[in-house]
Structure formats: C-alpha cells, structure tokens
Amino acid sequence: MDAEHTDAQHLMGLLCLHDQHYNDALEWIVRAIRRAPKPEYLASFGTALQQHGRFEEALNVVDNAIQLRPDDAGLWRQRGDILSQLSRLDQALASFQHALKLDPDHHDTLRKSGTLLHKLGRNEEAIAHLDLSDKLFPNHAPTLHTRAWILYTLKRFEESATEGKRAHQLAPDKADTCNNLGLSLRRLGRDEEALAWFEKAIAIEPHLVAAFNNKLTTLFHLHRFDEVFALSEHMKALGLNDTVTDWNVALARLLTGDFEAGWRGHQIRLKLPSAKYARFAQPTWLGDQDIAGKTILVAADEGLGDTIHFVRYVPMLAARGARVILAVQDPLRRLMSPLGGVSHHVPMSAAGTLPHFDLHCPISSLPLAFGTRLDTIPADMPYLPSPPDDRIQAWDNRLGPRTRLRVGLAWSGDPAHVNDQARSIPLRTLSRILDADATFISLQKGPRPSDATVLRERHDIVDLTADLTDFAETAALMSCLDLVITVDTSIAHLAGALGRPTWLLLPWTPDYRWLLDRTDSPWYPSMRLFRQTERREYESVLDRVRDELRARASSFEPRAH
C-alpha cells in the first residue's frame, strides 16, 4: 500500500504539471520522493523545476537520478535539455551524445544534437545527425525545418529550399519556415518567389520583424525602391522597424543618389551588431563645428575598401586647420603613411594608448561631415601617394618585357560578405576573357580552393601574390599594369584611388557607391562599370568585357622595358 501511495502522490504531481499548476506539482512530487527517491520521481521533479525556470536545481536533481540509474537514456536526454536551457552547449551536446550511445535510434535526440552542433558551428556533423533523424522518423516538420536552415548556412540553397518546402507542407502554419524558405530562394536569385514566401510569413505572423526586413531587402534587390520606402514607413507605423530596417533604407537612399538622407541614415551602421568602432569620451565631429586648431582622430570603422574609399577626405580636414591622427587597418598602414594632411599615424590596436585628441570621426562618416552631394564628390586623382619608384621598378622587372597589354585580375572578395554570392565570380567563369592577346596578372590574395585549382591549371595568369605582403606592395604592382579588371573588392578601390584604368564588374544590385544605370563612377574617374542586366548572370557581362579587351589589346603598342 505504501508503494501505491507514493505512486499516487507522483501521479498527482504529474497531473498538476500537465495542468501547469507548478507549485502544486512540486509539492506532490516532493512528498513522493521523501517516501521513495526513485529515479522516475526525481526526473519528474526535475521537469517541474524546469517549468518553473529553476534550471540549476533541476540539473542537480537529474544528476542525482542518473547516479541511481546511469543507463537511462531518458535521464541523459533530460540533462541535455536542461544544459541547453542554461546555454551550456558543449555539456548539453555531450549529454545528448551519451543518450545516443544508450539509445542510438532516438530521432528527437538526433535532432537536438544536430541543432546544438549547428549552434557550435559544426554544420556538417549537424546535417549527418539530422539526416539520420529524418530516416528514422520521416516527415517530421521540426527536423526538416532545422535541416533546411543549416543547409542555408552551408550555402546549399537548392537543398535548403527543397527541405523548406517539405517542412511547409507538413506544417503550413509556421511563419519561420516560410521566412527561411524565402531566404533560400532569394539566394538563388528567385526574388519574386522569395517575396511571396515573405508575404506568406507575414500573413501567418503579422509582427514577424525578420520577414518584414527580408521583404524589404527583396524589394531592394528588385529595384522597387518606392516600395522599399513605403514598407519602411508601414513598419514604423506598426512599431516594427529596427536598425536593420533603417540600415537597408539608408543604403537604398544612397544607391538611388539621395545623399542627403542617405548619409544621415548611414550612421546607423555604428549601431549594428557587426559594428567595430571603439567608444571614445571625446565628442564625435560630424561637420557641425569649427576644427581649426583642433586635433581630430579619424579611425577606420568598416572594411579595407571603405577605408581606401573615404581616406580622400583626410586632406580636407587638414585644409580646415585640423591636426589629424589617422588609425587604419594594419594592411593599409604602409600604403597610407605618406598621405598628406596626417600629423600622426596610429595602429587600430592602439585605442587604449592614443595621443591626445579633441574630437573623433569614423572614417565612413566623413561624407556626412562634409555634406557630400553627387556634384561635390571629391574626385581629384590619384589621392593615394604614388608607391616608391624602387618598388615599382622591382615589380616591373619581375613582369619582364612589356610586349603586351598588362591586365591585373581580381575575381572574389571576402567569402563572409553578405553579398559575396552576387559579387564574386568563379575563376573558371572569368576565364572566358583570357583569350585576349594580353598578359594577365593575378591580384587575388587567398583564392578559394576551387579557384586555386583553376589557377594551377592555367599557364596564362602570372601569379606573384605570395609576395603581395600588404597594400603598398599591391599598389606598386598595380602601377606596372595597363588595366585592372576586378569585382567589387578593396582591389577596386585601390586601383581607383591610384587613378589606374579599372574595369569594375558589378552585380545587378551593387554596393551603394556605384549607383545605378551608369557606366562611370563619380568617385573614381579612371573607372568603367560593367553591370549585370536583370538576368543577373556574369557570362554576358564578361562577353562585353572580352570584346572590349580584345580591341584594347590589339591596339597596344609595346614599350621599352
């Protein structure tokens, strides 16, 4: 009778737990444990504590249960759940993996292990766990949803879209599934389809900010800018706009030439999670006060290309009577050390040991500070100092006799860049321009494995990049070239800032500074822009480049070495 009595107390606790009466559940289960501390009672006590948000206590209780029954896979699973709630992901994964040793075919443990592996950045292992979970328990919407998202992070967008559609068929009321499916389709260039899925997500969950932001971004890539601005206002009315919304609207303003609103909005970048600009006690200068006699720190706050692009403003600060301290990324320091108007150069890492300054300005805020409009862009070229003659001569000697047009090539940027898929070109695709009668020189540092393979196969590209130790060396090599053909990377900005003839290959929706519907750049007079059409492919762009390159190469007159 006593055993039956404790079981009844435990059962009462479970009933209270089911009805979400957590205090009553705890009371009944504790009574049962006092009479008989069985592992199953302790497990229920742990669950009640979990539901109460008392995770550390729950973990201690479940650990006690495991000591009594160490081969119980369910207890190890529960331990993994609690550790996940405590954000102790490595320990949670270890608990789930131990549970799988005891019960290898438990699909939910496989799914949870896959989710944790993804959070820990071990995506290939995560997919393997989810594949097995799917085989053991097919057509399980949460598994498919998680698998679709991990495939997306692995840039396997076709597979991600397929899994997302399967998940949606099984759980059509899940807004996150619709939203993630839209993301995969957008990465595949299927923006109209993506737009429909974002709208479906919003219909299911009318306040899903991520879906609104993704819809806005898709309208941006469709060049439907009036709708971008209207949607932004609608989001504000709903209280849904955030820094991501404001950032994308600012980029749309700049891309469409509305610099006044665009530069103001551009400041939102400093509030994004990715912002890298240090905090200083001194005031920020944005053009609103006289700087004559003041010392101003100008520090890089975005990428290498942005620093090269906006360093043109530094001499303008000096012309206003300011003493300028310049902090740029290490690969740029030697290149910019002779720059006019700079009183003192400091490394980016010296934020804690800076000399005295009165004001500071992020380098990408200088266009705002100077009130830059399309017709006032400072474009006197070159604005970077010419590389030393001895370094130019050294590179010229390495390239040999100048019997043919010398063309520098850069075909990809940072793989982690949000727009990498659109702006980078596989070397095998770029190779269609290489039949021109020219000497091709790689400017591509750190080619991707697939591109490195192609580079080894080809004997018509001179690759000296191992000796391009910083941007000063790259600038010296560029000074020996007749033309640079590049995608939108720091190489493009370096070539433009040196005043080198440059052909820039652009995606359908480019970075804001290249504007729309023009073949020239007001920022870089020596640059020509070759844009994708609405078809969003580079083959036709490269065909145009090849035709023009052949004509240019055929008219080249050899010069003495």
Describe the role of every protein-language-model region.
Residues 1-483, 488-561:
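Alpha-helical solenoid repeat scaffolds of the TPR/TPR-like class and their adjacent stem/linker regions
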